[in-house]
Regions:
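N-terminal basic, low-complexity leaders that serve as flexible interaction/assembly modules and, when applicable
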Residues: 1-72, 77-81
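Short glycine-enriched loops at secondary-structure junctions
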Residues: 15-20, 65-67, 82-83, 131-147
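Short glycine/proline- and acidic residue-enriched helix-loop micro-motifs
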Residues: 30-34, 93-103, 157-164
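A charged helix-plus-loop insertion that forms the helical arch/lid used to bind
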Residues: 78-92, 147-154
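A gly/proline- and charged-residue-enriched helix-loop-helix capping module
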Residues: 82-121, 125
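Active-site loop segments of alpha/beta catalytic cores
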Residues: 107-232
Length: 232
């Protein structure tokens, strides 16, 4: 279906199918911080598999979080229950870019190991890998946490467009490397999530955000898997 071919029925999966709605998820996550669970290959695989076993969905979605790439890159970020991602030192200046190094070959080894374990258990059920889009991840780094109106992010776009572009460029490279690690480990498709991009007017999106999302897709195009972009 993702390759636009005829199928007997539309495939069914849920965006957040692995998570708090499942009692088995709550059991294995008890006492384990979110990002620790994401970076534990065996636990990430188990959580990914849970909704497939329970509901028989047509695809698994790898258990991760959009801030995992920056966590692996060394950014001090935690996921606070009831709040979301919280960044200890928000990004505000050119010097902050040094805290986002270029991806290295082993940066996402734990994620790749989790994907391989998952794929080995899934059989014919495909696995969808994902990453956060550069803009949405940048909004957490700039705001320091969730923000509906994104005042600091919008201010950086308007007042310091070169800094904003440099930040999104680095995040695009991290997202692409994160996706490549998942695909090369066996993911059958990928999705890029831009869950805060709807806060921007269309002009700012086209000028300052879209090129960086396109950069992510360009860096995984050679792998030949279906690619999905989700933005609200």
């Amino acid at each position: 279906a993702m390759r636009a071919r005829s199928v007997d029925r539309p495939p069914v999966w849920f965006m957040r199918q692995a998570g708090r709605s499942l009692p088995e998820y709550r059991e294995v996550r008890a006492g384990v911080p979110m990002l620790d669970a994401c970076l534990d290959p065996a636990l990430a695989a188990e959580i990914t598999l849970q909704p497939v076993r329970r509901h028989g969905v047509d695809a698994a979605i790898f258990f991760s979080d959009i801030v995992v790439p920056v966590k692996c890159a060394g950014v001090d970020v935690v996921i606070t229950p009831g709040v979301g991602p919280v960044v200890a030192e928000p990004f505000a200046a050119q010097s902050d870019l040094a805290r986002l190094p270029a991806p290295t070959p082993d940066m996402f080894d734990a994620v790749a190991a989790g994907v391989r374990t998952t794929v080995a258990e899934l059989g014919a059920t495909p696995l969808i890998g994902f990453a956060g889009a550069p803009f949405t991840v940048a909004s957490y780094l700039i705001e320091g946490g969730p923000s509906r109106d994104l005042p600091r992010t919008k201010a950086m776009i308007i007042r310091e467009p070169e800094l904003f572009s440099a930040l999104l460029g680095r995040l695009a490279d991290l997202a692409a490397a994160f996706l490549r690690a998942q695909i090369l480990a066996g993911a059958s498709a990928m999705q890029l999530f831009d869950s805060w991009v709807g806060a921007l007017p269309a002009r700012l999106y086209r000028e300052h955000v879209l090129p960086h999302s396109e950069r992510v897709f360009a860096q995984v195009a050679d792998l030949g898997v279906p690619r999905v972009h989700f933005g609200v």
